[in-house]
Amino acid sequence: MEETENMKHFTGRELPDNALKASMADGTPYVLPPWRVNDIILLAIETLSDVDYYRDDFDYKKMIREQGIKIKKFSAFSPDNLEKFRKISLSRWEEGICALFPHPVTGEQCRIIAYNENRNSIECMQIVFHEYAHIKLHHTQQSINGEVEATCFALAMTMFLLLEQLFHVGKTVVNAAGKPFLVQTIRNAIKQKEA
């Protein structure tokens, strides 16, 4: 049975095109409901709009660092330390790590994202956004739901940034009608599709 048929068999219905789906370890289908996909897309555009992502000098890593989150390449760690971070990571993905832990002296919450820099720039951005999503979506443990949500968030963030780089969509809309119009137009389009 192909994956689409498995999903139909498991859920008892055809899945909408915008359902994000994955398989759990035992092969049971996992589906992220369309309303949750929509919530995550809105969170992505709101996150980017809050920091004026359409500026020519926008740097996504700087945006994340300004929130007190450290970003490191895998090569910055010794193999032993990298393995320690993997064990406490919220992510189940081998390409990136998202670790939250108390500072040993101050007790303050430390947040770190580490990624495999041996990928092209778009893949690295996708990995960093995936790990950032675990923090942004307040995930507290590894789960298939967390992985699917993080993937959805990372795809939305990457899509908005690529559209901006290629076509200057955000800058054009903001210059013509203002930042609130950009976010509200996307929100309205999602609500209309849900109805």
Question: Each PLM stretch: what is its role?
Answer:
Residues M1-A195:
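Active-site hotspot residues in diverse enzymes, especially metal/ion-binding acidic/histidine motifs
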